[in-house]
């Protein structure tokens, strides 16, 4: 074999009869004990891209990934398999989801919508909160796709509820400043607290095809008597597939929103 060629190609992993669409864009990894494995992603629509780990072996100088049931040199991905042998045992754990912000640094599940600017936030771990600072939008602003200082985390499960308590202290000399809780994607929906000329207003808004520059639509709004509010989003995966979209796991997702002034009694708002 020569690094300069000639080159050959061969399909060594395909969806086959599984529900794992794709699969593609991955990397070969090996363990300290000599095992071979393959990492790849699966596009699951609103849930983002799931990471899969597949067993891998070498047959006649070609990698065979997943399970090769018919022994034709092309495997299918698996959902369940024995764990890699990494030389020692580790306890079962899951990525962090909740956060009381009791550290001076952001927990690793958080990510920004753009390259981080340290002026966007201040972590007050001693008192258990994070302070987020707002910045003016650009003249070309269309929707939140144009906003870099969104603090986000990946979808953690097919069904879950996210709740946050926030206190909004807008700059009094400006109107239009806002904050809130958003489920962000190609489309997005959320609860937004805005400083208006009539005081603080909580709105439930959506933006379809946000990635294409669409404008937000407000479904419902209420005036707030105080500046501390609890916001809740219930994320549910429905048992029906998005029409025309690829993948057995690309299912319709629904989000419902509610709010509370005391953290106990919640009222639905919007969709």
Predicted segments, located by residue:
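Carbohydrate-active catalytic/glycan-binding domains of CAZyme proteins
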Residues: 1-271
């Amino acid at each position: 074999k020569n690094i300069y060629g000639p080159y050959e190609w061969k399909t060594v992993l395909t969806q086959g009869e599984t529900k794992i669409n794709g699969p593609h864009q991955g990397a070969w990894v090996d363990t300290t004990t000599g095992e071979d494995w393959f990492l790849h992603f699966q596009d699951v629509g609103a849930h983002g891209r799931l990471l899969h780990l597949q067993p891998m072996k070498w047959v006649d100088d070609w990698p065979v990934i997943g399970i090769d049931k018919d022994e034709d040199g092309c495997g299918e991905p698996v959902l369940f398999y024995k764990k890699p042998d990494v030389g020692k045992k580790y306890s079962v754990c899951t990525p962090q989801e909740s956060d009381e912000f009791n550290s001076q640094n952001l927990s690793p599940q958080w990510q920004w919508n753009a390259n981080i600017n340290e002026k966007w936030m201040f972590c007050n771990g001693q008192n258990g909160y994070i302070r987020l600072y707002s910045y003016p939008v650009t003249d070309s602003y269309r929707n939140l796709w144009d906003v870099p200082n969104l603090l986000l985390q990946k979808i953690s499960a097919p069904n879950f509820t996210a709740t946050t308590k926030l206190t909004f202290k807008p700059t009094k000399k400006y109107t239009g400043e806002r904050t809130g809780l958003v489920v962000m994607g190609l489309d997005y929906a959320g609860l937004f607290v805005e400083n208006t000329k009539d005081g603080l207003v909580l709105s439930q808004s959506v933006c379809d095809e946000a990635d294409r520059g669409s404008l937000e639509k407000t479904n419902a709004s209420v005036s707030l008597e105080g500046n501390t509010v609890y916001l809740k989003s219930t994320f549910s995966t429905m048992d029906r597939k998005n029409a025309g979209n690829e993948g057995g796991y690309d299912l319709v997702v629904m989000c419902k929103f509610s709010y509370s002034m005391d953290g106990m009694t919640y009222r639905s708002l919007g969709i």
